[in-house]
Every structure is written in C-alpha cells, then in structure tokens.
Amino acid sequence: LKNILDAVLNTENLITNTNTLSKKSNNTFSLIGHSMGGYIALAFAEKYPQYLNSFGLFHSSAFADKEEKKEVRRKAIEFINTKGAHTFLKLTTPTLFAKAFTEKYPEKVSALMENGKNFTNATLIQYYEAMINRPDRTAVLQNFNKPVLFIIGEHDQAIPLQSSLQQCYLPLQSHVHILSQSAHMGMWEEKDKANNILLDFLDNKL
C-alpha cells in the first residue's frame, strides 16, 4: 500500500512514465482511477489527451476542494500528527463503506484497517496535502471529446452523490453508473456490478 501511495503522490513522474510508455505504442488506451487515482487520470488527460481513447473516474472528482473541505483535511493532518496514522485510519476507514457493508462484512473492513499499519504519519500527511492542493480540472472534462466513465457510490461520504452528478454533465460523452449499495469502495461493496461496468466500458472503447 505504501508503494502505491508513494506513486500516487508523485503524480508528475507517474504521468511522465505513462507518457513514455504511450510513445512506444501506436495504440491509445483507457485510464480509470479510483479516488485519488482519478486525479491522476484527469492530470494525464489534461496533458496527454491524444493517448487516451477514454478515461474514467471511480469514486473521484474533477472539482477542487472547497475551503471547508480543506479545513477538514487540515484538522485530519493535526490528528495524524498527534495520534498517529494507524489510529486515524482505524477511525476513518469504516466511513469509506456503506453501513450495511460494514455490518455484514466487519472482517473485511478490519483487514483493510490492519493494512493501515504500513502507512507512516509523513506519507499519510503527504496524501492529505496533495488532496488539499489539487487544482480544479473540470475543464478537462469539458474539453475531452471521447467517452468518460463515472462510477458513483450512492452513500459516498467522501464525494457525495450530488457533487458527483454535477460533473457528469460536463463531458461530451458521459457514461454514468450509480452503485446503490456502495459508499467509496464500490470495488469491494458491489464487486461484481463494478467489474461488469468496467468490462462493458472497456470492451466498447478498446
């Protein structure tokens, strides 16, 4: 998990490396990112749209944080500095899931919380600072003339349903799917449905 997060935080290097790979191939590809991975997909689409035949936001948003959201993240950073990353993740991880899922599969949520031991305070703080500082990229959605996938969790507290729907009107071609039993972790909460959505989208774009 830490290695994945380090890659996410180093967005510019990741975009550059993906661009290098793209230049070695004559084919375009689809790029789909979950949560902060969606910010990377947007950044890549902004810089290298010619290499994409489509892209997708899975529980992610092109909007920059509003000031009140930034303040919540700053308070999270204070908590991490005081109590530690693992304590913070034990408190916040359950909120990523719909209540029905946490009640039915507490062991899965616990396993994810256990993985949180791999995060250092510094790494998690970097993650939050990156989210605070990310720019608004709604113009990317407006200017991209190929298909854009949106997978939205009806019970998502991190990116509320109404906020997610607002961005769906921006692209020329939007493919919108709402997971009615999911919050922010639809690939776990409604795994089969999420996989089918992804496969159907990719089958039509590759």
Positions of PLM-derived features:
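Conserved hydrolase catalytic core segment
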Residues: 26-66
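Acidic beta-to-alpha connecting loop that harbors the catalytic carboxylate
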Residues: 154-157, 181-183
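Hydrophobic "lid"/C-terminal helical patch
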Residues: 5-8, 21, 92, 128, ...
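Catalytic active-site module of serine/aspartate enzymes centered on a nucleophile-bearing elbow/loop
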Residues: 172-206
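Short alpha-helix in the alpha/beta-hydrolase fold that links the catalytic acid
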Residues: 146, 160-169
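Conserved alpha/beta-hydrolase catalytic His-Asp/Glu region
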Residues: 65-71, 83-143
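Short beta-strand/loop motif that positions the catalytic acidic residue
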Residues: 144, 150-152, 156
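Conserved acidic catalytic loop of the alpha/beta-hydrolase fold
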Residues: 1-29
